[in-house]
């Protein structure tokens, strides 16, 4: 598949760099399961889907859950024992402060 070829080319060009692949369904995950990647981003999946993906991955690489995760459903994702969890809610409503330091 195209994603397999892409991963293999990236690995050849940058053997020391981490490769992180985003997948949004189990079929996509199965396509890359035998590839050498460091992290798979499981995007917009339910906790049940994340748990199923973790069974398929079986420790081959780290997995990060992201998308539609918020402070209300965070515990459900944490219970899956996924390696990483991203919560966009933390940064979506942030107001930045622009300041400078003059010496």
Predicted regions, residues:
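Short, flexible coil/linker segments at or flanking structured domains
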Residues: 7-9, 17, 62, 73, ...
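Short beta-strand/loop segments at the ligand-binding rim of alpha/beta enzyme cores
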Residues: 12-20, 53-68
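General beta-strand structural signal in soluble alpha/beta enzymes
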Residues: 21, 42, 65, 86-87
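Flexible C-terminal active-site loop/helix
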Residues: 77-103
């Amino acid at each position: 598949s195209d994603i397999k070829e892409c991963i293999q080319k990236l690995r050849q060009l940058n053997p020391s760099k981490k490769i992180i692949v985003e997948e949004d369904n189990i079929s996509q995950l199965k396509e890359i399961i035998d590839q050498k990647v460091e992290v798979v981003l499981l995007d917009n999946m339910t906790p049940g889907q994340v748990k199923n993906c973790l069974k398929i991955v079986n420790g081959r690489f780290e997995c990060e859950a992201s998308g539609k995760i918020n402070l209300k459903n965070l515990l459900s994702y944490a219970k899956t024992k996924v390696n990483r969890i991203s919560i966009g809610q933390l940064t979506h409503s942030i107001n930045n402060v622009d300041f400078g330091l003059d010496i």
